């Protein structure tokens, strides 16, 4: 039994585990990797939210055109968020504005604090400003 205790004591006096320097080096490496990864992740998340807002607006452009085709006045007068939702129950728009003459409209969606808008139709500029010819852009309705 005494031999077993002496054997155990000799193994405990030997090197085992990591030194403080080795642990600090590993900790510094992990911190550097996190410093690189976290900003990249946040940038990807921001771009995804911006693109989601643009996709929401792009999806609802046909609903706005359908409203105009079905209206008795053949323009966008009276179009609002409720009218778009009646056409497309899955609408994710947050703002719908119509120009003073009813000849143009602005659709807006907000995802994670990022706004996207579309001013249409793609004709001449109305009271809301120049149309967004390339599709939804970042920003809010005027």
For each predicted feature, which ranges?
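N-terminal single-pass transmembrane signal-anchor helix
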Residues: 13-41
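N-terminal leader/signal peptides at the extreme start of proteins
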Residues: 1-18
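Aliphatic-rich helix starts adjacent to a transmembrane/signal segment
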Residues: 11, 42-58, 71
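Periplasmic/extracellular, small/polar-rich flexible segments of pilin-like filament-forming proteins
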Residues: 62-142
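Residues at secondary-structure transition points
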Residues: 15, 47-51, 55, 93-96, ...
